[in-house]
C-alpha cells in the first residue's frame, strides 16, 4: 500500500497535477477529496484479490473470463505502462539537468539502466526497503507548500466549495487527474505484491485455503492501503496547490512537464522550493519505474502462466524478466523519438 501509493505520484503524475494546478488554480483541488475514497476502495479490492486467491489480477481474469478480454486488457496495460515509463525517465533526466546541468538524455539512459539492473539482479527482499525509503521523496512536495505563501482560508473554501468551470478544457483536466490518480498498473502491482508476500512468508497460504488467517491479513491490508493512499492523495493535493498558488496566480497557466513546473517555480517561490520540487521528481521516478515495469511483467507472465516474481532469480523467471526489461528499454528509447510521452499520457 505504501509503495503503491507513493508510486502513484510519479513524475508524469507530478506533471499532470502541475498542469491542472497552473491552468485552473484552486478550483481543481476538490478532485483530491473525491479520488481519495475511490483509491482506497479499488486498491483494497486489488490487494484482497491477491491475498484471497493467491493469484494476481491477470491470473484471475484468465480463470474467469474470455481470453480475448484478457489479451485486450494486457495490450492496453503494456502500451500505457511503456509510455508512462518513458515519461517518468524523461522527466527524471530533465529534472537532474536542472539540478546539476548536463545532457538530459544521457541521464535518462542512466536512470533506465540503474532501475533495470536493480530489478533484475538485486533480490526483492533487499530491494524492497530501497523502494520504501524512496517514498520519503514525496515529502519534498509537502515541504514545498510551506516555503510559498498560501491563503489557507481561501484554499479550504475552494477545496470544499469549488468554483468549477463548465467547459471542455476543465473537463479534460478533471479526467486527467482521475486518470493519473486511479491508474490500472497500481491494481496489478498491489495484487501481485500480496501474492509475493504470501509466498515469501512461511506458513501463509491463500485465504481460500487458510481462512483462519483472514482477520489478521485483511486488517493489515486495510491499514496499509489507507496509509499509502492518504500519503498519495495528500501529495497530489500539495502539488496542485503549489502550482495554483505560484504559477496560476502569476499568470503561468500552460505547463507541459514536471521539470518545466520546477523551473517556473524558481523565480516565484525561490531556490529552495525549486530544489525540493526537482529532487522530488528524481526520487519519485526512481520509485515509480520499477512499479510500472514490474506490474507489466506480472500481468503478461500471469496471462501466459509463466513463472513470476521479483524474488526469483533471472534464469528461473526468464519470461517475467524479459517483459520487465523490454518495457524499461522501450521506455528509454521513446525519449529519443519525436513522441512526447507526457502529452500522450495526458490525452
For each feature predicted by the language model, list its residue ranges.
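Transmembrane alpha-helical segments of multi-pass small-molecule transport proteins
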Residues: 74-75, 99-121, 137-142, 146, ...
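Flexible loop linkers connecting adjacent transmembrane helices
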Residues: 16-19, 44-69, 94-96, 201-204, ...
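Hydrophobic alpha-helical segments and their helix-loop junctions in multi-pass secondary transporters
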Residues: 136-163, 180-196
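Loop-to-transmembrane helix boundary motifs in multi-pass membrane proteins
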Residues: 67-70, 105-109, 272, 276, ...
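Extracellular/periplasmic helix-exit of transmembrane alpha-helices
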Residues: 38-52, 192-200, 212, 230-260
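Transmembrane-helix boundary/entry motifs in multi-pass membrane transporters
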Residues: 25, 52-79, 98-104, 226, ...
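Juxtamembrane transmembrane-helix boundary signature
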Residues: 3-4, 31-64, 73-83
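Hydrophobic transmembrane alpha-helices that form the core helical bundles
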Residues: 48, 52-53, 70-101, 108-113, ...
